[in-house]
């Protein structure tokens, strides 16, 4: 019996799942004739999922999040019975004799050796199924996304991969599940794996939703292992945390000097009637790395280049995976720009 999972079954830094009702309320009460939605920094895709009845444009520069977007939002038809059979085979396969890239580099870190052997086997095999035409692009993405969710459920971490818990007490078995993505989707949905600034003007939409990184903590650092498995180039890894070279994956939005410049460039390029910008002040942190890189004044100034701006605020403490976990002053802000210039 194959279990299922949905898009919300994942801990992820900055995930807005618990704010979806509030975000939709702001849109419904202040925007008109919304038929298309651009999730510019999609992450897990939770916000895009709230607007999946619209024509979607979804973008993220991380390959792991791109696969998730394909899984949840690509209009390509999938064979769920075939996916179920593949998942059953992976869940019952004994990979204990399979030495591979994962077991050689990550055994007894985030996972025990047997789990690493299985992850490596599955990742190799699903690429083989794609290259031989046994699965299509979206089916391939569904299996990889299922693998990521399975890894997250049992990883020996605090919810991200910046480090692992070094007590040797590994629990749980890697179990892939079938994604709950059997719902109608617009045939014109577009999914991108790119720097959002580079593709911002490719699609004309009614509303563009921006939820960029807030501070200097790079997502490619926190989720380097999932990105490694997604790219599957099998690079050398370094240090205790076993990280690959991530030089080309760094986001300008995590850097104080570049964040405002990057946002202004993006805002000027967007082709939309509304810009909805989500930003968390992260409270007042003792660690400067956790402080927001953009001020409210900078955000309003930049958005005002395109139109009139309204600001909505709610108290919210998102998933932080141990980062400044005792902070209670977090506020989520929504800046809504009605584009008229």
Language-model features: locations:
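Conserved proline-anchored active-site loop of SAM-dependent methyltransferases
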Residues: 23, 37-51, 58-63, 203-222, ...
């Amino acid at each position: 019996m194959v279990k299922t999972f949905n898009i919300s079954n994942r801990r992820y830094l900055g995930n807005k799942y618990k704010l979806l009702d509030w975000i939709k309320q702001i849109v419904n009460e202040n925007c008109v004739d919304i038929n298309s939605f651009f999730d510019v920094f999609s992450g897990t895709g939770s916000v895009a999922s709230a607007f999946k009845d619209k024509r979607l444009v979804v973008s993220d520069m991380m390959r792991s999040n791109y696969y998730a977007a394909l899984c949840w939002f690509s209009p390509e038809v999938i064979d769920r019975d075939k996916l179920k059979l593949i998942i059953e085979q992976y869940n019952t396969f004994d990979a204990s004799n399979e030495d591979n890239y994962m077991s050689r580099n990550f055994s007894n870190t985030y996972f025990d050796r047997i789990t690493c052997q299985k992850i490596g086997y599955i990742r190799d095999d699903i690429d083989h199924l794609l290259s031989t035409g046994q699965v299509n692009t979206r089916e391939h993405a569904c299996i990889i996304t299922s693998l990521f969710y399975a890894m997250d459920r049992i990883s020996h971490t605090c919810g991200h991969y910046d480090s692992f818990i070094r007590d040797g007490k590994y629990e749980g078995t890697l179990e892939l599940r079938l994604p709950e993505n059997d719902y109608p989707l617009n045939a014109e949905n577009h999914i991108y794996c790119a720097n959002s600034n580079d593709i911002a003007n490719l699609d004309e939409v009614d509303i563009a939703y921006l939820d960029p990184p807030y501070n200097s903590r790079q997502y490619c650092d926190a989720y380097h292992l999932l990105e490694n498995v997604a790219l599957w180039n099998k690079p050398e890894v370094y240090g205790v945390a076993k990280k690959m070279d991530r030089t080309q994956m760094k986001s300008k939005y995590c850097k104080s000097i570049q964040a405002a410049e990057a946002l202004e460039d993006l805002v000027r390029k967007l082709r939309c009637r509304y810009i909805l910008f989500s930003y968390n002040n992260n409270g007042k942190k003792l660690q400067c790395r956790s402080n927001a890189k953009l001020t409210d004044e900078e955000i309003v100034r930049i958005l005002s280049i395109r139109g009139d701006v309204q600001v909505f605020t709610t108290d919210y403490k998102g998933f932080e995976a141990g980062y400044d976990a005792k902070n209670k002053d977090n506020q989520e802000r929504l800046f809504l720009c009605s584009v008229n210039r």
